């Protein structure tokens, strides 16, 4: 099935539905045709039908460059940090990055109230967020604030630990509250 000029849905040799990405891969293709191997840039083998459906829907409306950036960030995380990530990261991170790029182009920057805690409790994931912010700047010339690296880090926490994004936010929030109580009791001011 052709999703757009750059994305097609197909079945691999085992009968598993896959989503295939490549520049112009869907252009002038007909249903049932074999996908030209030389045009394949990435194959998404998603075991969950619901995630596969969300991914196809997301990829259909997103610029290929943004999908490629997201995929590169995920590949970097798996390779350099040796992270085992839930497949939902392809949907959640790609969607987040696309929305963040749109916001930043309009000059809208969201403050990440948990940035300090994210840096302290999830340093590896925060470094991935920094890598993502730098990659977006390099490829698309879109400046993203450091706060965005923190938001991106939470997507990796979620995918790494198999939790809901709300759970990934809950821990640093609780730590922030605990540190506030300790600071109040000791009569000290805590900073970075």
Give residue ranges: language-model regions.
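A cross-family "folded-core" feature that marks the main globular domain of proteins
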Residues: 1-192
